[in-house]
Regions:
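Intrinsically disordered, charged low-complexity linkers and terminal tails
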Residues: 1-194
């Protein structure tokens, strides 16, 4: 079986976030099947670490592609992380809060629906303290419970855990951000018609 890498994806995959996420999932499935071909005795500690890393990455991609959302918060957090995370997958809360506030301010400036009326970002528009509390309670907590993100109080940063972040190339960052854009577009279309 020939190895599939992100460089072997079709150009169409890079133009269609849904298609690219399917390709990424297929990559994960191929890695799973090649690993299963090894007997338990043949698996090394490196294989086991790799399995855990690949499995966490696959779960992250699955979560991104099938994000359940009551509000727009999760895709915005992922977009902020894709934009501001450093080489270690960490982004400051200040940058993340700025991203949220700028996102909602831009929607307001364009005369678009900002969020549901009960949203913190509507009720406390522009309030950094309320934004911080909401980000840490809702979208972040969901990813933390799944072992995908951590929050470091000392540095005031959210981190995408290394087993996931180490598998995210710049191309994948762009694809994930594009996919979040598509999810936000669908979310707001639905919100504006209800």
């Amino acid at each position: 079986m020939s190895e599939i890498t992100i460089d072997s994806f079709s150009q169409e995959a890079f133009e269609d976030p849904l298609l690219l996420l399917e390709e990424l999932k297929r990559m994960g499935q191929l890695a799973d099947s090649s690993r299963e071909a090894k007997s338990v005795e043949q698996q090394t500690e490196e294989d086991i670490v790799s399995t855990n890393s690949e499995e966490q990455y696959k779960q992250f991609i699955d979560e991104v592609s099938d994000m359940k959302k009551s509000f727009s918060y999760k895709p915005i957090l992922i977009k902020a992380m894709m934009e501001y995370a450093d080489v270690n997958g960490r982004a400051s809360m200040s940058d993340i809060i700025d991203y949220y506030l700028n996102y909602f301010q831009t929607r307001a400036d364009q005369g678009k629906v900002v969020e549901k009326a009960e949203s913190t970002f509507v009720q406390h528009f522009g309030d950094r303290k309320a934004a911080r509390r909401t980000i840490l309670i809702y979208p972040y907590k969901r990813f933390e419970m799944k072992g995908m993100m951590k929050f470091d109080k000392a540095s005031d940063q959210i981190e995408i855990v290394p087993p996931i972040w180490d598998n995210i190339s710049n191309k994948i960052r762009r694809v994930v951000a594009s996919y979040c854009d598509a999810q936000l577009l669908r979310y707001y279309e639905k919100l504006e018609t209800t």
